[in-house]
Amino acid sequence: VLLIMVGTVFAVGPAGLIVTLCKNSGMSGLLTTTLFWLIIILVYYFIATFISIDAIIGKIYPVFGICLIIMAVGVIFGIFTNPAYTIPEIWANFSNMHPSNTPIWSFMFITVACGAISGFHSTQSPLMARCMKSEKQGHFVFYGAMVCEGVIALIWAAAGCALYTITDGKMAGLAEALAAGQSAAIYDVCAKTMGGVGIALAMIGVVICPVTSGDTAFRSARLTLADWLKIDQDSYANRLKLCIPVLGVGAFLGIGNAMGFINYTVIWRYFSWTNQTLAMIVLWAASMYLFKEKKNYWITAVPATFMSAVSCTYFVLAPECLGKMINTYADGKLVAYNTAVAYPIGIIFAIAMLALFIHATKKHTASQKA
């Protein structure tokens, strides 16, 4: 489910940005329709999902990664060198700046998704492990990549705070920019901080990089299903049997958004929650593995406990999950989040998961002594 969600959001987002780039370049007609570009991306996804990882993207992926890093550096450099932009001092603005007063806990941790911790990245472990020469490279590749992505997320957060108007302590300017869509906001930030060069980098960094993540997601979904169903993937016919349903679901969600009957922000939130929940599960699994290997398991057990609280709290509070049952609505609109119920449930769930883990470790230790 997560992998298909990843593929979907990384098809719809780039398609929207391409449309923005085309419109701002003076184009019109078919080239300025999201559906057109979405279909092109989905066709590419089908080809990339069908063939091996090294057939298309394996050799040029590092180039796109470098472009993404250069774009992030360019954004922060553009902020620091322009006296009109000032990043708000963190302690003076240590408050909820969301115009709609959406709770920071745990919406912020779900929204940032891959910028903090990513279950999706863990699904790529089997593929990436085959690309490394030794286990020691795992620290640099996996941990290093997540730290790098976290820095990029912080840069974009800083850009959102520095470039847009803050009214009465709320990020009203950023909310207005995002009202035109995430693609328009990305285009605006790159244009303001880097000019024409920024727009070109946005094309590479925010269009091509997500697309390459999307094709990886769909390919991984195919391989995961193949493992579950014991379907050999050497045969092109067997690959096709899995490619069609996997891409079919992604196409339904993506085209549904392009045609206006599926909300992209809802797809993104479901992806984000699924992503962080998988991260929680993997952290608990890693904790038990480290315990059995007689290594320091607290380095994963502590973040696993934290992510348990994050995932559970969001599931209870979010309108697209259980929020409609406990939050306050007026005339069909959300007016208040019931944090008094959601926060304790999230904390209790996290404590219960930690207690279950500790019980499992003691049970394993006792069985080893017997």
Give the predicted meaning of each segment.
Residues 12-36, 127-150, 185-188, 214-242:
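Helix-loop-helix connectors at the membrane interface of multi-pass transporters/channels
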